Amino acid sequence: MASSSKALIESIGSLDKDSYVSLLSKLIGESKFVQNNPPELIPQEDLIVKHVLDSLRPYSTETGGGPLVINHVAYHSGRGNLIVEYPGSVPGKILSFVGMHMDVVTANPDDWEFDPFSLSIDGDKLRGRGTTDCLGHVALVTELMKKLGQAKPALKSTVVAVFIASEENSSIPGVGVDMLVKDKLLDKLKSGPLYWIDTADKQPCVGTGGMIPWKLQFTGKLFHSGLAHKAINAMELAMEGLKEIQARFYRDFPPHPQEEVYGFATPSTMKPTQWCYPAGGINQIPGECTVSGDVRLTPFYDVKEVITKLQEYVDDINGNIERLETRGPVSKYVLPDENLRGRLTLSFDEASAGVACNLDSPGFHVLCKATEEVVGHVKPYSITGTLPLIRDLQDEGFDVQTSGYGLMATYHAKNEYCLLTDMCQGFDVFIRIISQLEQV
């Protein structure tokens, strides 16, 4: 390690555990009010902003106590974003930590072993809703910017932190990072790596999946189950129709060679997750049912192409429904005497594309080196979970890399927690990223 890099790391030091836990306790204490599930639960992210500002204002240009430049930007009342900048000396040389969102998913206290809306400590475990996703990261990056404001290291790079509103639910548009990008408030971040801090397990996450939510309605003919030859069984139509659609999907979108390069845990998948049918007696063959599910698509396939293909499958099945496999000697999907044919109807909700991070980016190599130095090993991974906001950033020209220091096992889960030692390592990774980019 170069002496200047080592000196920078030593000047900033490690995470102040007491300060971190104190701040996180305040944030988790607000988590009940930043649950994001409209229309019932609309988060008030400014409750989180207040605590972050209380930590950083003493080291800001606003108070004259330090170099931090703070910009609180709100597009909806009570739902602010926060941009915090530590200025460097070289124009255009910049790195950023983005994605630390100030809303959380819902939690039912009756289902938890401890109060989700107050921080509790069990050894190394810091427990509560948002500790892993993502208030733990809000507190961590706040402590990073606070340390920079206190130590005032002479950096060539400008370091920017962007705390965002409205990540967990997009049903209310125009609140968070999408608006910051639209208003060009983040444009200068395109000059350097943008680290999206909202994943888990201390390793670079280099790929995420796209998502295509779909719904298939199956229409047959309801009839008495003792006269099965007079019915078109919508459930059987659903089972066989969906089986055929899945077979065609996996034929046309097989595992992609790049998935191994990126370490994806799974290839693209198309599967049902919900089944709905009208209530009726057990002696009634149903005339309709609905199956819903999703496609999880690795970023090496095009979302629009998949949507087109799925519709083609359905159109072909409808046009040749006599060829679809049946179940038993009287099972059928056509009643010629009644001029009735079974029918599939496909619809989609809003789709999003996946992300493949740039593995040739200096920002990626710096993240890997810092992770190896601190954690002891580096193993980038990819999942077909979705982070649509970072795909939008990538499409806008940002060099997005992702990492996080919570636990994947507790992400969106009951009894959520993170580990203080993991967050300490995350802080050390951040400092090494900054120090290494000083040498680039």
Swiss-Prot record:
Q: Catalytic activity annotated for this protein?
A: N(2)-acetyl-L-ornithine + H2O = L-ornithine + acetate
The entry's protein name is: Acetylornithine deacetylase
Q: Which proteins does it associate with, and in what oligomeric form?
A: Homodimer.
The entry marks the following residues as binding Zn(2+) 1, namely: 101, 133
Write out the transmembrane intervals. Answer: none
Pfam families annotated for this entry? M20_dimer, Peptidase_M20
The entry marks the following residues as binding Zn(2+) 2, namely: 133, 168, 412
Q: Which GO terms describe its biological process?
A: L-arginine biosynthetic process
What pathway is it annotated to? Answer: Amino-acid biosynthesis; L-arginine biosynthesis; L-ornithine from N(2)-acetyl-L-ornithine (linear): step 1/1
Q: Which InterPro entries match?
A: Bact_exopeptidase_dim_dom, Peptidase_M20, Peptidase_M20_dimer, Peptidase_M20A
Please share the entry's free-text remark on the cofactor.
Binds 2 Zn(2+) or Co(2+) ions per subunit.
